[in-house]
Amino acid sequence: MLALVCSCLLLAALPADTWSGPAAVELGSDTVEQIRDTHAKVTEIWQALTQQRAAQGEPAGALHAVCRVQPSATLDAAQPRVSGLVVFRQLGPGAQLEAFFDLEGFPVEANLSSRAIHVHQFGDLSQGCDSTGAHYNPLAVQHPQHPGDFGNFAVRDGRLWKYRSGLAASLAGPHSIVGRAVVVHAGEDDLGRGGNAASVENGNAGPRLACCVVGASGPAPWARQAQEHAERKKRRRESECKAA
């Protein structure tokens, strides 16, 4: 990449007659000095960019995406209005995907409940979450082996907050989920064990409460969620120490 940038800048910087005529291969001292200056500037820029990513704790090839969850436009008045954020990070093409799920607006129930979250085929929200299509299934396999079958998430006091790693989906390559929809369902995923056709298609997860379209992003949304994750772990440890 650095060599490519250098080449482009050099082509733009050198006079036109440098590349024509019998003496095209002979560079004067001024031109050589100009090449050295350009190389030094490009190297400085590249090092600054690399150091910036390193300071953020991110490798240069890390990929990020964000999905801002909103209630489906087709919900009945009695259904809950779920909203929030899903942020993704992949340290490079071929690396495993990880995500933070931060959602609220679920009913506050006495017992812990679980809700299914899946990636659906289309990023089309023109008819709410109903127009996102079926599960994204590029390899034509049965549920729950779809790349975006994220499974069930525990809801406590009307909120869902979870970090998950090792997800099968990807932000890169021919099966990227960027531009597709994340859908939050009203029910629990039976993980293909329901004994009917719907079970191996969608896990009998029920109506679609909320959804969003996955979009590429910078590292900032991930950094904020990672900070909250670290603070939660710290509070949990402190609570355990006090209880002991």
UniProtKB/Swiss-Prot annotation:
Cofactor-binding details, from the entry: Binds 1 copper ion per subunit.
Coiled-coil residue spans: none
GO cellular component terms given for this protein: collagen-containing extracellular matrix; extracellular region; Golgi apparatus
Residues of this chain annotated as glycosylated in UniProt: 111
Domain of life: Eukaryota
Residues in the signal sequence: 1-18
Entry binding sites for Cu cation: 118, 120, 135, 185
Pfam family, any one: Sod_Cu
Residues where Zn(2+) binds: 135, 143, 146, 149
Positions with biased composition (Basic and acidic residues): 226-244
Positions of the UniProt region annotated as Disordered: 221-244
Key word Glycoprotein present: yes
InterPro entries from the UniProt entry: SOD-like_Cu/Zn_dom_sf, SOD_Cu/Zn_/chaperone, SOD_Cu/Zn_BS, SOD_Cu_Zn_dom
Subunit structure, interactors included: Homotetramer. Directly interacts with ATP7A; this interaction is copper-dependent and is required for SOD3 activity.
Job description of the protein: Protect the extracellular space from toxic effect of reactive oxygen intermediates by converting superoxide radicals into hydrogen peroxide and oxygen.
Entry similarity comment: Belongs to the Cu-Zn superoxide dismutase family.
Record-given protein name: Extracellular superoxide dismutase [Cu-Zn]
